[in-house]
Regions:
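Hydrophobic, membrane-inserting alpha-helical segments
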Residues: 1-22
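Catalytic toxin/effector domains delivered as secreted proteins or via bacterial secretion systems
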Residues: 16-198
Length: 198
């Protein structure tokens, strides 16, 4: 196809979602790369990695991951779960994060490497430029923390040109979204350990 035709067809993909990945091979999808790059909505490398990981995934699924950046599987919002006093979870923070910083997401499983943070937890580089510092938190005495819990969904990091696969066997917690923006996070959880990973 010519560039004008490709741009027109790609526009249809973006505007109406009428194209599906099952109608496009990786080679055909690559024809849209220039258009994708101009709009900042995709790349050949991340599209190929997405299709390798999701053979039945569509171009619409790909665009939804790029644009919505949802931590949850498509169409889901996490399952309401209660963390009780003494429950623990792990969190990656920026290397230069102040000691009192408590992020918004934690994970049940222990974090053992930066590769784990990037790939299993699907943490994009513009979310955390560094992630060597891991903190373990515990829910405060007398507290029940109502969170959303669920598997870690993939992310597409266009800035780094990477498909970050996530891990649907793991449990992540959206810790404070249900509580509003005015709360003090330290009223709910406290740090019990901090360690460095490579």
């Amino acid at each position: 196809k010519g560039a004008e035709s490709a741009a027109e067809d790609a526009g249809k993909v973006v505007e109406s979602g009428t194209y599906s990945g099952d109608l496009m091979s990786a080679e055909e999808a690559a024809r849209y790369s220039e258009y994708w790059r101009e709009l900042g909505i995709g790349s050949d490398n991340t599209w190929k990695a997405f299709k390798d990981a999701n053979p039945n995934g569509t171009i619409d699924d790909y665009f939804e991951i790029v644009q919505k950046q949802s931590p949850w599987p498509l169409g889901e919002t996490g399952t309401p779960t209660t963390l009780k006093a003494g429950d623990r979870f792990f969190m990656a923070v920026e290397n230069n994060a102040p000691e009192n910083v408590i992020g918004g997401f934690g994970v049940k499983e222990r974090i053992d490497s930066t590769d784990f943070v990037r790939n299993n937890l699907a943490v994009k580089y513009d979310w955390k430029t560094s992630c060597n510092v891991i903190r373990e938190f515990e829910v405060n005495s007398g507290i029940e923390l109502n969170v959303n819990a669920g598997p870690v969904w993939p992310q597409i990091d266009l800035g780094a040109d990477l498909y970050l696969p996530g891990d649907t066997t793991m449990t992540q917690y959206d810790l404070f979204s249900n509580l509003g923006s005015e709360i003090k996070r330290e009223d709910y959880v406290h740090i019990i350990d901090e360690y460095w990973v490579d």
